[in-house]
């Protein structure tokens, strides 16, 4: 356990005059003093509030207060790191039971704080006519040991040297050697002075110096405490730094007020963070915004934009990657392809099976996922690449007929023979009939006439055939026109 610092004693002259200072005087009711306010009847910030409820038995949480160690509105508030020094009056006017109440008050405040080297550090300065530093800021780093040390503190003697106590705290407790943090750390330096009497030394100048050095002073007055002196010791604004209770029996109720004072509100819980997606508490009332998976934080550090997952080239899509508004993505396929079950690769569609190809005769799937149209034998594909027209095989000259090729209406043809000839079994070649052979081979005098007669007969046959062919071609044209405009 750290060794207590030696008490600081007054000059001999003051000690000789001390009995005169202790003569009892008529103390008017503090409530009746001009300008004296009962601060326990006011809420935070000086607004009207409830009076403290009657004191609960030791160890039991008072009605309307939080349990020790649990912040009111748990989760909303986290204590800020502080260098905190309690300056407690233990003069003879503070009875032993009342001094116990003061220690309970100190312990209750400690319960609401996060204690540790990187969190709040606590020291206690005990004073009466002398001043004693019970333990320094660096002495205890855990809450249990700290509260045990508070419990071991004993009262000193007569006298109320509040100014000397503040000076001692400033010179010896709030130093780097004693455990205070460097000014560059921006850790607040806070002193809470608890007294029930009028200071017997000057407090205004020493309090002003303490405040000028960066120490924030809170003054808690009990019973016959002098309000003017409390105001001289406390920092501005006074309505936030001066407290008063009528008896030590209710002083511990003020612990909740200090809990609110030292609380760093969590904007993430309060809903004031303005983060579009996720709010992360950093402690000390600070926070930062983060984004859900698939999003990135914008320059304003509050709103989020979807990541371009497709641009990252990690999507695995075989054909096309499409960003979604949700910050994710999905795969699509080129025209003529369909997405496989793995939702990434693509397979060519069977456009012909879908029945949407528009081919008049035959639809053929291509390897590219597309298709093309073809026509039945004897037909040719039109310029629209979908419809078909009858092909004139006789005109193509590939029919193989020896004499005459006759086109049929079904994109086919058949062979015919000149008059005097008959079609052979191969349906292509012709052979002269017996009559024709006889007419051609005659050598008698009538042969010339017979030849002329044969020629006339052949000419007549040819004329009839030409007429028949013209009729057939006309019918084919009409049929083809009807198929194109169907």
Curated annotation (Swiss-Prot):
Alphabetized GO MF terms:
calcium ion binding; extracellular matrix structural constituent
Return the PROSITE patterns for the record: EGF_2, EGF_3, VWFA
Coiled-coil portions: 456-480
Q: In the UniProt annotation, what is the result of changing residue 192 to N? A: In EDM5; retained and accumulates within the cell
Where does the record place it?
A: Secreted
**Per UniProt, what does mutating residue 219 to D do?**
In EDM5; retained and accumulates within the cell
* Known outcome of mutating residue 134 to K: In EDM5; retained and accumulates within the cell
Entries under InterPro entries matching the protein: cEGF (IPR026823), ECM_Assembly_Org (IPR050525), EGF-like_Ca-bd_dom (IPR001881), EGF-like_dom (IPR000742), Growth_fac_rcpt_cys_sf (IPR009030), Matrilin_cc_sf (IPR036337), Matrilin_coiled-coil_trimer (IPR019466), NOTCH1_EGF-like (IPR049883)
Boundaries of each VWFA domain copy? 83-258
Q: Which GO terms describe its biological process?
A: cartilage development; extracellular matrix organization; skeletal system development
Query: What does the entry state regarding organ or tissue expression?
Result: Expressed only in cartilaginous tissues, such as vertebrae, ribs and shoulders.
Primary location class: secreted
Q: Where is this region: Disordered?
A: 32-75
Q: Show the disulfide pairing.
A: 268-279, 275-289, 291-304, 310-321, 317-331, 333-346, 352-363, 359-373, 375-388, 394-405, 401-415, 417-430
> Which Pfam family name is an example for this entry?
EGF_CA
Which residues are modified to Omega-N-methylarginine? 198
The alphabetized UniProt keywords are: Coiled coil, Disease variant, Disulfide bond, Dwarfism, EGF-like domain, Methylation, Phosphoprotein, Repeat, Secreted, Signal
Secretion signal span: 1-28
| Gene Ontology cellular-component annotations | collagen-containing extracellular matrix; endoplasmic reticulum lumen; extracellular matrix; extracellular region; matrilin complex
Residues annotated as domain EGF-like: 264-305, 306-347, 348-389, 390-431
Q: By its UniProt entry, which SUPFAM superfamilies does this protein fall under?
A: Chicken cartilage matrix protein (SSF58002), EGF/Laminin (SSF57196), Growth factor receptor domain (SSF57184), vWA-like (SSF53300)
Extent of Low complexity compositional bias: 49-64
Q: Which disease is it linked to?
A: Multiple epiphyseal dysplasia 5: A generalized skeletal dysplasia associated with significant morbidity. Joint pain, joint deformity, waddling gait, and short stature are the main clinical signs and symptoms. Radiological examination of the skeleton shows delayed, irregular mineralization of the epiphyseal ossification centers and of the centers of the carpal and tarsal bones. Multiple epiphyseal dysplasia is broadly categorized into the more severe Fairbank and the milder Ribbing types.
Instruction: Please give the function described in this protein's UniProt entry.
Output: Major component of the extracellular matrix of cartilage and may play a role in the formation of extracellular filamentous networks.
Record's subunit section: Can form homooligomers (monomers, dimers, trimers and tetramers) and heterooligomers with matrilin-1. Interacts with COMP. Component of a complex containing at least CRELD2, MANF, MATN3 and PDIA4.
The identity of this protein, by name, is Matrilin-3
The major lineage groups are: Eukaryota, Metazoa, Chordata, Craniata, Vertebrata
């Amino acid at each position: 356990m750290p060794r207590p610092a030696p008490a600081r004693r007054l000059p001999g002259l003051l000690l000789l005059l001390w009995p005169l200072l202790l003569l009892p005087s008529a103390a008017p009711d503090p409530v009746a003093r001009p300008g004296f306010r009962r601060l326990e009847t006011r809420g935070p910030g000086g607004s009207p509030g409830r009076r403290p409820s009657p004191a609960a038995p030791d160890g039991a949480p008072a009605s309307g207060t939080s349990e020790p160690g649990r912040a009111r509105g748990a989760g909303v508030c986290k204590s800020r790191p502080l260098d905190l020094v309690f300056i407690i009056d233990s003069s003879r006017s503070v009875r032993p039971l009342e001094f116990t109440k003061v220690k309970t008050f100190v312990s209750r405040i400690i319960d609401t704080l996060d204690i540790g080297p990187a969190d709040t550090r606590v020291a206690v300065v005990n004073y009466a006519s002398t001043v004693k530093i019970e333990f320094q800021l660096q002495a205890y780093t855990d809450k249990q040991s700290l509260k045990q040390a508070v419990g071991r503190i004993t009262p000193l003697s007569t006298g109320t040297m509040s100014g000397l106590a503040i000076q001692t705290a400033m010179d010896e407790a709030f130093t780097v050697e004693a455990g205070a943090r460097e000014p560059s750390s921006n850790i607040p330096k806070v002193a809470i002075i608890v007294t029930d009497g009028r200071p017997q030394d000057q407090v205004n100048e020493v309090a002003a110096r303490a405040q000028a050095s960066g120490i924030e002073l809170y003054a808690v007055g009990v019973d016959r405490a002098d309000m003017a002196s409390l105001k001289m010791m406390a920092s501005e604004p006074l309505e936030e730094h001066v407290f008063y209770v009528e008896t030590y029996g209710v002083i511990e109720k003020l612990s909740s007020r200090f809990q609110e004072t030292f609380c760093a509100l969590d904007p993430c819980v309060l809903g004031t963070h303005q983060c579009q997606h996720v709010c992360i508490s950093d402690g000390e009332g600070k926070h930062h915004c983060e984004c859900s998976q698939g999003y990135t934080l914008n320059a304003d550090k509050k709103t989020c934009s979807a990541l371009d997952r497709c641009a990252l080239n990690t999507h695995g899509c075989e054909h096309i990657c499409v960003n979604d508004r949700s910050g994710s993505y999905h795969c699509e396929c080129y025209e003529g392809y369909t997405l496989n079950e793995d939702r990434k690769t693509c397979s060519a569609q069977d456009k012909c099976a879908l029945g949407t190809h528009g081919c008049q005769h035959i639809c053929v799937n291509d390897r590219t996922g597309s298709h093309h149209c073809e026509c039945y034998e004897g037909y040719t594909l039109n310029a629209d690449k979908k419809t078909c027209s009858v092909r004139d095989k006789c005109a193509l000259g590939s029919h193989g007929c020896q004499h005459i090729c006759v086109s049929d209406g079904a994109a086919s043809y058949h062979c015919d023979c000149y008059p005097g000839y008959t079609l052979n079994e191969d349906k292509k070649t012709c052979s002269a009939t017996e009559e024709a052979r006889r007419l051609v081979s005659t050598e008698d005098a009538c042969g010339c006439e017979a030849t002329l007669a044969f020629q006339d007969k052949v000419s007549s046959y040819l004329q009839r055939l030409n007429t028949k062919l013209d009729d057939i071609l006309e019918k084919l044209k009409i049929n083809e026109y009807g198929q194109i405009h169907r």
